[in-house]
């Protein structure tokens, strides 16, 4: 799912200048340009948990997702656009070492792409088996999944 929002400092300054309240969430926008009519989200099947024992197949799967991202993000904005891949319930049910293998391979694939990553972020997950790529690839909690579902429905 993709969202676009204004620079926070600019939004604050604009609200102050116009006498608008600061305690209101900013409006999320679809952005501009020729890609504005493209859908903001894409879901492909099966989920990440289906790659148990076959992490070598993750590249093609992730590339399907990234092809969609490239259709809505202008090419000149890719290096400033962070990518986050958030896995849900199916991945939470897997053994920690299996989750970690899938997350790490997903991290390796997206690190090869032209998107923004903090240069200090390492590919490894360390002791945390639910996160890789400094949080760019992770298994979200049930609470986070519910919150993001609410956002998707309401925005």
Regions found by a protein language model. Give the residues of each.
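Nucleotide/phosphate-binding catalytic cleft detector across ATP-hydrolyzing
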Residues: 6-155
């Amino acid at each position: 799912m993709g969202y676009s929002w204004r620079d926070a400092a600019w939004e604050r300054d604009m609200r102050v200048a116009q006498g608008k309240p600061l305690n209101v969430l900013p409006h999320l926008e679809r952005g501009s340009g020729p890609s504005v009519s493209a859908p903001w989200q894409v879901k492909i099947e099966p989920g990440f948990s289906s790659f148990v024992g076959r992490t070598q197949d993750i590249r093609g799967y992730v590339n399907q997702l990234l092809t969609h991202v490239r259709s809505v993000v202008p090419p000149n904005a890719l290096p400033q656009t962070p990518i986050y891949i958030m896995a849900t319930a199916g991945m939470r049910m897997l053994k920690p070492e299996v989750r970690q293998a899938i997350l790490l391979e997903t991290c390796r694939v997206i690190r090869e792409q032209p998107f923004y990553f903090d240069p200090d972020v390492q590919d490894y997950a360390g002791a945390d088996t639910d996160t890789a790529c400094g949080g760019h690839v992770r298994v979200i909690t049930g609470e986070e999944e519910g919150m993001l579902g609410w956002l998707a429905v309401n925005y």
